């Protein structure tokens, strides 16, 4: 499913087709404690762009491996790998960048916020790990997916167009997930009920490369169709922790793939943070997309 979501993000290049330039932003990747995969439906997060790991084999085999290798279920953050100390206790250590798999194409490259291209995200995070505890390491973040390129400034006129395309894209992603959901658990039952109303509405603007004037008119005419998609995306991003606020880290999975296609991405999210506290609350997020204050409802974040 995560591969399917990556495909949707690629399609966003057309739906969100503005000049292919962007500004520098930040991403901080937190180390995750060892946690096994929970029962969250695969694909519940529409902005995860990494491929999941697939384990084949019977339970007995897995149990034997775990017993022989304590690192089996010890998860480390990006840039680190598990090794055993003298007492056979698993620990996370920085990965040697040279041990990263060789890239197979340009699409694997990433750009850091100091405008340096890395062969892959593995190479970037392994390098960042070696700089832990230094000023340079603290400031170094993954900016966007793809090799570094010239990023033009986002003009005020362009900034006003960004939420028009983004709103339409969010709605279309939800509708697509709904159409592909049969037997795939892409959406929860509550989400399906909400999206069903959008899907069956004959007034819904079909996905396509529409002029911003049409997108603006559609938002005005069919405003109610956009309320849930905006809330839904906030809920997909607000994961670590689930606290009603989006950090730079939580925004990164959405931001990084969009920046090469939408050069106003960084500035848009910066303007959403009205109180400049480095976090975007639900009220700020919804307001950025034109949702009226009386229609902002935490119960819609499902």
Curated annotation (Swiss-Prot):
Disulphide-bonded residues: 71-82, 76-92, 94-129, 100-122, 111-148, 154-264, 272-288
Classification via PROSITE patterns: EF_HAND_1, KAZAL_2, OSTEONECTIN_1, OSTEONECTIN_2
UniProt record, GO biological process: bone development; cellular response to growth factor stimulus; pigmentation; regulation of cell population proliferation
Protein's name according to its UniProt entry: SPARC
Binding site for Ca(2+): 273, 275, 277, 279, 284
EF-hand domain residues: 260-295
Organism: Mus musculus
Segments forming domain Kazal-like: 88-150
GO MF annotation, one: calcium ion binding
Similarity remark: Belongs to the SPARC family.
PTM description: N-glycosylated.
Domain called Follistatin-like: residue spans: 70-92
Stored SMART domains: FOLN, KAZAL
Main localization of the protein described in the UniProt heading: secreted
Function: Appears to regulate cell growth through interactions with the extracellular matrix and cytokines. Binds calcium and copper, several types of collagen, albumin, thrombospondin, PDGF and cell membranes. There are two calcium binding sites; an acidic domain that binds 5 to 8 Ca(2+) with a low affinity and an EF-hand loop that binds a Ca(2+) ion with a high affinity.
Compartment annotation: Secreted, Extracellular space, Extracellular matrix, Basement membrane
Glycosylation positions in this chain: 115
InterPro entries in alphabetical order: EF-hand-dom_pair, EF_Hand_1_Ca_BS, Fol_N, Follistatin/Osteonectin_EGF, Kazal_dom, Kazal_dom_sf, Osteonectin_CS, SPARC/Testican_Ca-bd-dom
Gene (UniProt): Sparc
Signal peptide: 1-17
A GO CC annotation given for this chain: extracellular matrix
């Amino acid at each position: 499913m995560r591969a399917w979501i990556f495909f949707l993000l690629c399609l966003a290049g057309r739906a969100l087709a503005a000049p292919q330039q962007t500004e520098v932003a930040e991403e901080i990747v937190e180390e995750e404690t060892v946690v096994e995969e929970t029962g969250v439906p695969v694909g519940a997060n529409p902005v995860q762009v990494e491929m999941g790991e697939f384990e084949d084999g019977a339970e007995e085999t897995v149990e034997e491996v775990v017993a022989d290798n304590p690192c089996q279920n010890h998860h480390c953050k990006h840039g680190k790998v598990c090794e055993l100390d003298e007492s056979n206790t698993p620990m996370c250590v920085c990965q040697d960048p040279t041990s990263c798999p060789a890239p197979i194409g340009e699409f694997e490259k990433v750009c850091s916020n100091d405008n340096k291209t890395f062969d892959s995200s593995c190479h970037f995070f392994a390098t960042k790990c070696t700089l832990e505890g230094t000023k340079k390491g603290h400031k170094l973040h993954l900016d966007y997916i793809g090799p570094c390129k010239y990023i033009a400034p986002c003009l005020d006129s362009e900034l006003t167009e960004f939420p028009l395309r983004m709103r339409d894209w969010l709605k279309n992603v939800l509708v697509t997930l709904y159409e592909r959901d049969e037997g795939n658990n892409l959406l929860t039952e509550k989400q399906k009920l909400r999206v069903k109303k959008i899907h069956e509405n004959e007034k819904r603007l079909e996905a396509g490369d529409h002029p911003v004037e049409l997108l603006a008119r559609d938002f005005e005419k069919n405003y109610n169709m956009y309320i849930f998609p905006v809330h839904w995306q906030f809920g997909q991003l607000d994961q670590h922790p689930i606290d009603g606020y989006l950090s730079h880290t939580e925004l990164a999975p959405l931001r990084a793939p969009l920046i090469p296609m939408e050069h106003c991405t960084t500035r848009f999210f910066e303007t959403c943070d009205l109180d400049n506290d480095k976090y975007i609350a639900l009220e700020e997020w919804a307001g950025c997309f034109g949702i009226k204050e009386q229609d902002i409802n935490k119960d819609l974040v499902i």
